[in-house]
């Protein structure tokens, strides 16, 4: 059973401006995400893709970012580069209220100008 589907698209230039501002990175990205971004070349597209994935997941949850913060979602990559989601204890409780054994699947893509992501919560 599908709990929710979310999609997001963002201009990479917008994220480029945002990450240059004091505090933005720590408000949006976890320490593990920031380390992972550094390992992957510190590319603006990576920041944008992760941001877009978090927004897509919040839409799939159905609440937007009202009951949790974007740092309650962590977007990491497996050994093959496939993105996966780790949720905080707080967000886990919210999701378990919807379905005990939920699963979050995401896909992230980008072009030169845009990053996009899709999320499905099963």
UniProtKB/Swiss-Prot annotation:
A Pfam family the protein falls into:
ACPS
Q: Can you quote a single GO CC term? A: cytoplasm
Q: What is its main location?
A: cytoplasm
EC number per UniProt: 2.7.8.7
Report which superkingdom the organism of origin falls in: Bacteria
**GO terms classed as biological process:** fatty acid biosynthetic process
**Which co-factors does it depend on?**
Mg(2+)
The cross-references to HAMAP family, in alphabetical order and at most eight, read: AcpS
- Read off the NCBIfam families from this record: acpS (TIGR00516), pantethn_trn (TIGR00556)
**What protein is this chain from?**
Holo-[acyl-carrier-protein] synthase
| Species this protein is from | Fusobacterium nucleatum subsp. nucleatum (strain ATCC 25586 / DSM 15643 / BCRC 10681 / CIP 101130 / JCM 8532 / KCTC 2640 / LMG 13131 / VPI 4355)
Q: Which gene encodes it?
A: acpS
